[in-house]
Structure formats: C-alpha cells, structure tokens
Amino acid sequence: MTRWALSPEAADDLERLTDFLLASQAEHAFGTVDLVLKALEILADHPKVGRPIGQGLRELVISRGSSGFLALYQYDEAHDIALILRVRHQRELGYPQR
C-alpha cells in the first residue's frame, strides 16, 4: 500500500482554504478539509490515479458540488510514496508560488 504525505506547503494550503471558508461559508469549512483528506486516501491504493501534467507531477481532481479542489502531487515509485505538493480550489488560477 502506497504511503502519502502532505508537504508543508500543502498543509499551509489546507489552512488557507479553511480560513477562506470560515470567512465565507463557515458551515462547510471543516467538512471540506475532511473531504479533501479523505479523497487523498485513494492514493494509498491507486497512486497513479491523478492525471499526469508533466515533469513527473500528477493532479488529483477532488469533486465538491459543482466545483472542487485540485491536489498536485508527485509519486515516487521507488519508495512507493505520494507527496502532496499543493492543494487549491478549482477556480483559483494556478498554484500559489513560494
């Protein structure tokens, strides 16, 4: 079974998304983070499920209603680990730069 882990940046992204939702849709904030984390669990059994986007990166689409989230990750087949690099809402333009 593949292990998966959040990078510090991905953890920050989840915190940023939670803060945004607390300000705009408080009733959905924590449920949304749970939804994202639960969706990432699919990587344990299917680490290549995300669409390849080049440079060894993949993107997992996480549906929520009429929109959803995208998780950018890299799967290291040799070590059987999927590292979640970034998480963003589908309506955001690109991933935050650090």
Question: Over which residues does each language-model region extend?
Answer:
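Enriched for short, Lys/Arg-rich terminal
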Residues: 64-98
